[in-house]
Amino acid sequence: MNRLMILVFAAVFLALASADEDVDIAKRGIPCLCVSDGPSTRGNKLSGTIWMKTGGYGGNGCPKGWHFCGKSRGLLSDCCKQ
């Protein structure tokens, strides 16, 4: 069971790390709460997408054409909006 969880986590991590090559990532990524979405997730649309921080991006972890929209920065990922 632990091996399966590690495998699934690694697959999601690799998919998100290489997602900048995907044209339609805004519809495929993991949604996150932007500051502009409101105070809670109940009934609010999650308009951000979680991006994994990689070496090719700037200090904010968001790819070119996207901007940071979350309340705080994550250790390995940021909530970004196109």
UniProtKB/Swiss-Prot annotation:
Disulfide topology: C32-C79, C34-C69, C62-C80
Residue ranges the record assigns to the propeptide: 20-26
Keyword line: Cleavage on pair of basic residues, Disulfide bond, Ion channel impairing toxin, Nematocyst, Neurotoxin, Secreted, Signal, Toxin, Voltage-gated sodium channel impairing toxin
Record has Secreted as a keyword: yes
Record protein name field: Delta-actitoxin-Aeq2a
Domain of life per record: Eukaryota
Keyword Disulfide bond: yes
CC terms in the record's Gene Ontology section: extracellular region; nematocyst
Subcellular location: Secreted; Nematocyst
Lineage, highest ranks first: Eukaryota, Metazoa, Cnidaria, Anthozoa, Hexacorallia
Signal peptide coordinates: 1-19
Predominant localisation class: secreted
Family membership: Belongs to the sea anemone sodium channel inhibitory toxin family. Type I subfamily.
One Gene Ontology term of the molecular function aspect: toxin activity
Role played: Binds specifically to voltage-gated sodium channels (Nav), thereby delaying their inactivation during signal transduction. Causes death to crabs (minimum lethal dose of 25 ug/kg) and mice.
